[in-house]
């Protein structure tokens, strides 16, 4: 009787090589997912806030409410005693916010801020942990450099906002502004500062109904369409007039 021919087995060396490749790939994948998991976990720190924001939309505030005036220590673009007040709620990781600052703010500055028709009060509304840490970085910068930090962070947003190594990228940017790694680490670890930023976001969400960025209020009235710079001027003409209140830190 003739036995059927057996299939030729793969060489042992080849099998070992395949196993090693699979192990290496698995290890690399585990490392990737571990990093991604860490980032996801960090970003959930603000997820609860987002849920709180959309669960209840408050009734519109009176335009004269103190929330729509510049507060001491806030960053103000333009002349602090300008008659009109534009409030901007912004997230440092928000691409639309970056676009506003690069493409629309210069025109707004020329038409309204430099002429004294209005001032722009910049407020933080971080949407995720990278934005929160970038906000802390701005607040830890010297007062006279905060506007420049915001400008650079928006210009370099693609470098850090969507990176798993966003803290390292932020440290690189901070170094250009004179903050060393130890100062940045201390800034990120400042729980009081973090709580103050998150509290400001909660106030905007629960009292003014802010649920996206950027959001703008012109003399206390929400500007729904800010797709063009001249919409701000038109809103100023129709919005309630408010007495000038020279507060905040002028840029």
Name the predicted role of every residue range.
Residues 2-57, 65, 91, 173-251:
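C-terminal cap of thioredoxin/glutaredoxin-like
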Residues 65-84, 249-250:
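A short beta-strand-turn-helix
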Residues 71-75, 105-107, 201-204:
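A generic local structural motif
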Residues 80, 113-115, 130, 208-211:
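Extracellular/periplasmic catalytic domains that process cell-envelope and extracellular macromolecules
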Residues 86, 94, 184:
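Residue-level signature of catalytic and energy-coupling elements of molecular machines
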Residues 90-93, 98-175:
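Structural alpha/beta surface segment adjacent to cysteine/selenocysteine redox centers
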